[in-house]
Amino acid sequence: SGAAVAAGLVTCALGTDTGGSVRGPAHNSGIVGLKPTFGRVSRHGVIPLSWSLDHVGPMTRTVKDCILLLNAIEGYDDTDPYSVSMDPINIDINGNFDLHGKTIGIFTAFTEDILSKDVEINIQRVLDSFKSLGVNIIEIGLDQLSKSEAQQGPILYDIIVGPESAAYHYTNMEENIDSYGNHPRRRLE
């Protein structure tokens, strides 16, 4: 989907993001991908990987298109038990909004081990641009979280996703094992 958006084959696409399946393709294709707040967009009709972590999100070529698509798909849905009633996101898509006095938090804990120098430089450029618009930038660390605890994140992800996806797919896999490709089958078995 991300490649189709980037190539101009489609104006937009929806994806499901549990561990990066909207944000990763967006990053790799140079497009906009958004993982909305949990419960903002209904997941009714989506085959789950993990019902407690799945998000439906837009992929577009521009931020403006992303806002338009998000506005079209967000909202409470009583057919999704995890849907939450939230105020809609109201952003002036013409860019006529004032960021002065707004605050952005940037997570800095342990990033020195995972960011390349180029990424660090680009993040700093973006932060400098925000600062020039009057945005307050605050660093968010996890002082109480040790590095070893933070590295357990992927393990905890697997502890949640594995059983949830297996529970959903168990019956179908028993009856239609050949309908699953090698990678999904290995992941679920």
State the predicted function of each range.
Residues 105, 135-157:
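Short connector loops at secondary-structure junctions
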Residues 18-44:
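Glycine/threonine-rich beta-strand-loop-alpha-helix active-site module
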Residues 91, 117-143, 169-175:
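Acyltransferase
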Residues 16, 26-29, 61-68, 99, ...:
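Conserved active-site and cofactor/substrate-binding residues in soluble primary-metabolism enzymes
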Residues 1-27, 59-63, 67-70:
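Active-site-proximal alpha-helical scaffold in enzymes
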